[in-house]
Regions:
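Alpha-helical transmembrane signal-anchor/signal-peptide segments
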Residues: 26-43
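Non-transmembrane, amphipathic alpha-helical segments
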Residues: 18-25, 49, 72, 76, ...
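Hydrophobic membrane-insertion alpha-helices, especially the h-region
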Residues: 4-21
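Short, solvent-exposed, charged loop/turn and helix-capping segments
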Residues: 60-78
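Alpha-helical segments in soluble extracytoplasmic regions
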Residues: 38, 42-65
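Amphipathic, well-ordered alpha-helical segments in soluble domains
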Residues: 32-36, 53, 60, 83, ...
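Structured, soluble extracytoplasmic/luminal domains of envelope-associated proteins
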Residues: 75-125
Length: 125
């Protein structure tokens, strides 16, 4: 009986600890990604963004994405890849007006993903 109760408490503590870590990691990763995307958006508005700016953001995303796959479904992260690839294509061609909406979509997705997978009553029911 005592072992069962101890096992239940240990399991509960592990679940809570992993949940807190997951929320922290996802939120900080997307916060950092949003800040980087906002700087790219600003540079694109000024038409000073380069393809290299975009590839450095993609490198950041690729590094973080592998760990995010543990917490977030593949389809949510895949949409980020598609939008980033299109934005990079427009930056490569220096079509800044076409790149801006793609970066806006990336900013929107980066804002909604953490909220969709955060522990909250609206995500339970």
């Amino acid at each position: 009986m005592i072992r069962t109760i101890i096992s239940i408490f240990i399991t509960f503590a592990l679940i809570v600890t992993l949940s807190v870590y997951e929320m922290y990691y996802v939120h900080t990763t997307f916060r950092d990604y949003t800040e980087i995307l906002q700087s790219l958006y600003h540079k694109t508005e000024l038409q000073t963004a380069t393809y290299e700016d975009g590839t450095s953001i993609r490198a950041f995303w690729e590094k973080k994405k592998h760990r995010l796959h543990v917490w977030i479904p593949h389809t949510s992260l895949q949409e980020m890849d598609y939008q980033m690839d299109e934005a990079l294509g427009f930056l490569y061609q220096q079509k800044y007006e076409d790149a801006l909406p793609k970066i806006e979509v990336l900013l929107g997705i980066a804002e909604t993903i953490p909220h969709n997978y955060t522990f909250g009553i609206e995500n339970i029911f």
